[in-house]
Curated annotation (Swiss-Prot):
Coiled coil: none annotated. It is found in: Cytoplasm. One of its GO terms (molecular function) is catalytic activity. NCBIfam families: PRK05421.1-1 (NF003839), PRK05421.1-2 (NF003840), PRK05421.1-3 (NF003841), PRK05421.1-4 (NF003842). The keyword Cytoplasm applies. HAMAP family: UPF0294. Keywords: Cytoplasm. InterPro entries: Endo/exonu/phosph_ase_sf, Endo/exonuclease/phosphatase, UPF0294. One of its GO terms (cellular component) is cytoplasm. Belongs to the UPF0294 family. This is UPF0294 protein YafD.
Length: 266
């Protein structure tokens, strides 16, 4: 685990809290007392979006219109500006961000907004070998109404690297987390799978973890070299709906997926 790898937790009315990686997998489900479940409904709605460091107009209106009804919002390239922190703490019980690198004013990295407090939180970082910029990932776990624990993995994969060694290396600690979790899993984010070797490495990883890919019928996901960059993988859940929202508020389009935590597909 790298030095300087930590998560910052934002909760309404409380000072921001720094959370270090847990010492062992044994703490999954034991790190914090299980509180209210993520959803009291028979469905779990998520929004997945590389928000482009909030550099474009309309990002906040997209979050307000589509994020407020979601139980989970998985952001990549999220800068902890006052506007984003205000939205997160006003609409969610917890917001956890892993600073990948610190910009002049506000740290940027993956950020998970959740309608329940996580019972486990593990920040991860990997440095890009060419630009020396870090990319981050965040593993959080939430109680479900049926007493199962849902593991959520928010990923922003390394972009600039020769070959796929560094790309695959970033997936290894994520795989360790998933392998030690017996319940349902959602793994989503910007995987930068713009080459065939990267896509093959990602699909191989998903197979090894018994993860399925969410399919989008009108697939308007951001592409590079003809390949989609953003993905949602899952296990132990059913997919009810999946759509891509076309917007100019970022250089990526948000993914909207509704799961039901009932009996998983065979």
């Amino acid at each position: 685990m790298r030095k300087n790898t930590y998560a910052m937790r934002y909760v309404a009315g409380q000072p921001a809290e720094r959370i270090l990686p847990p010492g062992s997998f044994a703490s999954i489900g034991q790190a914090l007392p299980a509180g209210e479940p993520l959803s009291s409904e028979e469905r779990i709605r998520i929004l997945v979006w590389n928000i482009f460091k909030q550099q474009r107009a309309e990002w906040l209106s997209v979050l307000k219109n589509y994020g407020k009804d979601a139980h989970l919002v998985l952001l990549q390239e999220a800068q902890t500006t006052p506007e984003l922190v205000q939205f997160a703490t006003a609409n969610y019980l917890a917001a956890d961000q892993v600073p990948a690198f610190v910009l002049p004013q506000h740290p940027s990295g993956v950020m998970t907004l959740s309608a329940a407090h996580p019972v486990y939180c593990c920040p991860l970082r990997e440095r890009e070998p060419i630009l020396r910029l870090a990319k981050s990932a965040l593993v959080t776990v939430y109680p479900l109404p049926d007493t199962r624990l849902l593991m959520v993995v928010n990923v922003h994969a390394v972009n600039f690297s020769l070959g796929v060694d560094v790309y695959s290396k970033q997936l290894l600690p994520i795989g360790d987390q998933i392998a030690h979790h017996s319940g349902p899993v959602i793994m989503a984010g910007d995987f930068n799978a713009w080459s065939r070797p990267r896509m093959n490495a990602l699909y191989r990883f998903a197979r090894e973890m018994s993860l399925r890919q969410v399919r989008f019928t009108d697939d308007q996901r951001r592409r590079a070299f003809g390949r989609p960059l953003d993905f949602v993988f899952y296990r132990g859940l059913n997919v009810n709906e999946a759509s891509v929202l076309v917007t100019r508020a970022s250089d990526h389009n948000p993914l909207l997926v509704e799961f039901s935590p009932g009996k998983p597909e065979q």
